[in-house]
Amino acid sequence: MKVLLLVLGAALCQNADANPTWANEAKLGSYQDAWKSLQQDQNKRYYLAQATQTTDGVWGEEFTCVSVTAEKIGKKKLNATILYKNKHLTDLKESHETITVWKAYDYTTENGIKYETQGTRTQTFEDVFVFSDYKNCDVIFVPKERGSDEGDYELWVSEDKIDKIPDCCKFTMAYFAQQQEKTVRNVYTDSSCKPAPAQN
């Protein structure tokens, strides 16, 4: 309850800068530590449960079944394997990306994630944490450009909660999506999004 009241309080405050209303380190920074959250990816698979966008530069058009696992390869640096489908791909496809953290909206603690695709044609993307409970879910902001208060939202959920997403996670996603009049869609559709168990 305390988390939800803080979120609502921050959303109602007007910021003189172009920062999103939730970009308030003093009040909400303890729920937006990027590296603290990313360390959870080393222990379990996370699924993109919901999103407000339909197209991604890597996952393609009408992407679905997006999930990620990661392993640490350096100080605050991860090697991530992302699985996804889209309207042209009915089988899961892999994308390998290097993930680091950065400071967005003048924060003193890293609250953003930078993804760099691996391979001959690299692409770089930057997202920002809106909320993390550091065990079940993350709400991520995908800005139109660095420093913008306009963009899309994503809800990532751990593998052990994807079939029963905690209400606080769904509420936070829905609340900020409607602030920008965005429509939330389900990216995780059903159990067919889960990769087949590894064969021994």
From Swiss-Prot:
Expressed in salivary glands. Salivary tick protein that acts by scavenging histamine at the wound site, outcompeting histamine receptors for histamine, thereby overcoming host inflammatory responses. Binds histamine with a high-affinity (Kd=1.2 nM). Contains two binding histamine sites (H and L), that appear to bind histamine with differing affinities. Histamine 2 binds at S37, D41, Y115, D138, W156. Disulfide bonds join C65-C193, C137-C169. Keywords: Disulfide bond, Glycoprotein, Secreted, Signal. Contains 2 sites/pockets that bind histamine with different affinities. Site H (high affinity) is indicated here as binding to histamine 1, and site L (low affinity) is indicated as binding to histamine 2. N-glycosylated. It is found in: Secreted. It comes from Rhipicephalus appendiculatus (Brown ear tick). This is Male-specific histamine-binding salivary protein. One of its GO terms (molecular function) is amine binding. It comes from the Eukaryota. Its main location: secreted. Pfam families: His_binding. Glycans are attached at N79. The keyword Secreted applies. Homodimer; disulcde-linked. Histamine 1 binds at S37, D56, W59, E97, F125, D138, E154. Residues 1-18 form the signal peptide. Belongs to the calycin superfamily. Histamine-binding salivary protein family. GO terms for cellular component: extracellular region. GO terms for biological process: symbiont-mediated perturbation of host defenses.
